[in-house]
Amino acid sequence: MEQQVLTVRDLVTAQSLGMKVLSGAGGLDRQVLWAHSCELSDPDRWLGPHELLMTVGLCVPHSAVEQRNFIVKLDEAGLSGVALGDHNSLPPLTRELYEEADRRSFPVLLTNQATPFAAIGRTVAAATATTQTMQVLKLSKLYQLSTYARTDPLRMMNDLQALLRAGLSVFDVQTGLTIVEGAPLEFMPTSVRERTYALPGDSDSRLMISEYPGEEVSSFLLIHVLQVIDVALSQLLRSLRRRSERSTQMLASIFEGRSPDGLGSILGPSGTSSGYQFVAVALEDSEKVARAASIKSLPVLAGPGSSSFFILMPEQSRNDVRNLLHGLDVRAGVSSTYLDLRDAKAAADEAAKIFSSGGTNGLWTDFTGVPVSLLTRSRKEASAIVQQVLGRLAGTDPKITVLRETLFAFLANDRRWNETAAALGIHRQTLSYRLTRIKEITGRDIASSADLSAFWLAFQAWPSFSDRSD
């Protein structure tokens, strides 16, 4: 036999309680599982679905706008209604409060001075004794499920969903990404009710509960659900933080020219065997990007540079990284493809240059033009290109160094004479003389498209060559 559930109408029609309806009569069939008094300014935080708020008016705001919002918040929290004590502390009720309660069919009741709130509470408790017993049994089962919260949080989420008949998911506030969630519930209606709650131990995460209409999770259980999920999440978040820290340390080692141990534990067994690219993003996006990469367990390395935050991504992770950054609305510059990790600094510099010159029109800017990385797969090949193109101009003699820096400045300033002269602090005549000397030494002319392309390749390969020379 179906258990009869206490409603607001039952309380109003009980003459011994002396209650009458002020507004929201359309909601008299709302269920009442508990009645609780609260005089705090935000009672919607402390009471939950199917609970009746009892107050002498201390928590009721005075202005019309605030009273309307008062009703809105109570209704959105799922309360059964509000019972106002006929007391001097009750402020005058406004038309806006009545209208909002009627519009939402949210019962606003008035109790006479002779009715203590304890009488209402005992009436509700007696009528819902069986329901409360079921809640205690559910609580016992909930803590049985919590025994593997640390070892298998996904299994725990699925079992909690089955126990509560509600969808559960934890998402990251900063990125909006789901950290852990139960499997999709069958036959979940489109009119599902969703509520979010902060977790006790992690201010950056929220629990979202998706409930069937009329089957909301009670506030009695909710407190314990939050505690159990918080325990499971703390272990998971620690693992994510450790992964992020290892990723940063490994990338720093690669930048220093060392091959870090355990690289496969993050990049996977294939690692960078098919090539890798660097992605540069703004430093202010670093925390969000690093957190998102860890939550998604992407096989990438991520860490800061001097002017950008970098991601080293194997070729096979490119689409995943691009989709992630697009979802975060983060702008990125992407290098060409490299094979040798000893070229990591050159690849990162290339990505940083692309990012700084990429503008703001697109979120993802790829390397365009002649991909130097196709020719310089290693420092050895970079050295070959530099020596072949520059010849004696690659030497360390001070006069040669001045000429080489002049050539590189000319290329960096897109062959603009005035800008190059200004950057070097010399006259145009001096610049002309130096370019003539460069032609004499290298046998290459900046007026020739072929020679200019060769100079540009040598310019791009120089960082790897100079690191090798050092």
Curated annotation (Swiss-Prot):
Keyword Glycosyltransferase listed: no
Gene Ontology terms for molecular function: DNA binding; DNA-binding transcription factor activity
Keywords, alphabetical: Activator, DNA-binding, Plasmid, Transcription, Transcription regulation
Protein's UniProt name: Transcriptional activator PmfR
Pfam families in the record: HTH_30, PucR
Disruption phenotype: Cells lacking this gene do not produce the MabO protein in the presence of nicotine, in contrast to the wild-type. Transcription of the nepAB genes and of the mao-ORF55-nbr operon is abolished in the mutant strain.
Organism: Paenarthrobacter nicotinovorans
Pathway named in the protein's UniProt entry: Alkaloid degradation; nicotine degradation [regulation]
Function as written in the Swiss-Prot or TrEMBL entry: Transcriptional regulator involved in the activation of the purU-mabO-folD-nepA-nepB and mao-ORF55-nbr operons implicated in the nicotine catabolic pathway. The sequence GTTT-14 bp-AAAC seems to be the core binding site of the regulator upstream of the -35 promoter region of the operon.
InterPro entries listed in its UniProt record: CdaR-like_regulators, PucR_C-HTH_dom, PucR_C-HTH_sf, PucR_dom, Trans_act_PmfR
Subunit structure: Forms oligomers in solution, probably homotetramers.
Gene Ontology biological process terms, A to Z: nicotine catabolic process; positive regulation of DNA-templated transcription
The keyword Transcription is annotated on this UniProt entry: yes
NCBIfam families associated with the record: TransActPmfR
